[in-house]
Amino acid sequence: MTLQKKIIELLGVKPAIIPEIEIKNCVDFLKKYLVNHVHIKSLIVGVSGGQDSTLTAKLCQMTAETLRKEKNDITYQFIALRLPYGIQYDEKDCQDAIRFIQPDQIFNVNIKKAVLSSEKSLKKSGVIISDYVRGNEKARERMKVQYSIAAMKQGLVVGTGHAAENITGFFTKYGDSGTDINPIAKLNKRQIRLLLKNLNCPKHLYLKKPMADLEDEHPQQDDESVLGVTYDAIDSYLEQKKIDIRSQKIIEALYLNTLHKRNLPITQ
C-alpha cells in the first residue's frame, strides 16, 4: 500500500461527496453523541470568521435547533465564542459569520492580556518565548477559555479540524486540536467550501483565503505560504488523484514530520 492510500484510509476522506448528505451526516453525528450523553446540553465553537469554524458552528447551531424540536427540550444550546487577540483585522468577516450562523448564545473573550501575562511570567523566570511560540500560546489560551465555558454550561468543545489540516499537522498540539468531538474531520478544504455554499453562506466567507494569523511578526500570512503547498494539491492528494511530484513530496514530508501531533501521548 502506498503512503498516499494509507493516509487516505486513516483520515477517511471520500473522493467525492454529496453536500446535503454530508451535512446530514455531520448533524446526525453530533445529535447522536448528545442524545447518548444526556448531561451535555450545549455545543461550543470558537468562531474566527474562517471557513472551518463557520461551517462547524453552523452545523452545531442546526444540531441544537433540531434537538430542541425533536426532544421538546429548550435546554439544548449552541454557544459561539469570539476569542480575538487584541483587535482582529478581519472583524467584519467574523461578524458576517455570526450573522450567518445565528448562534443561540455568544461570548466575547479577548485573550491578549492572558497571553501577555503568561509571557511576562515566563520572562521573569528567564524564559523568553519566540513569536512562533507566542502564536501557539494564543491557540492554547483560546482552547482553555472554551473548556472553562464548557464546564459552566454543560458543554462539549467542538473542533474545527479537518483532513487537510490533519495530514499536514497544521494545528497546535493541545491548542486547536484539543477538542472533545470533530464533526468535519473527514472533509478536505474544497468539500468544506461545498458544504458552506450549500448552506447559503456568504460567498466572501467560503472563498476566503485560509490563514491561522497567529504570529505577530507575520500578520495575515496565509496557510499556503506557510505550508509551501496549495490546498488544491492537498485536497487532490486526499481524493487519491495524481498531483505533481514536488507537491506530493511536500505533503508526505509534512505528514511524516508531524506524526507526533497525531499520536498523543507517547507511551511505553
From Swiss-Prot:
UniProt keywords, alphabetically: ATP-binding, Ligase, Magnesium, Metal-binding, NAD, Nucleotide-binding
Residues annotated for Mg(2+) binding in this entry: 52, 165
GO cellular component: cytoplasm
Protein's GO biological process: NAD biosynthetic process
Keyword rRNA-binding: no
Residue positions binding ATP: 46-53, 160, 189
Database matches in HAMAP family: NadE_ammonia_dep (MF_00193)
The protein, known as: NH(3)-dependent NAD(+) synthetase
Lineage, highest ranks first: Bacteria, Pseudomonadati, Pseudomonadota, Gammaproteobacteria, Enterobacterales
Name of encoding gene: nadE
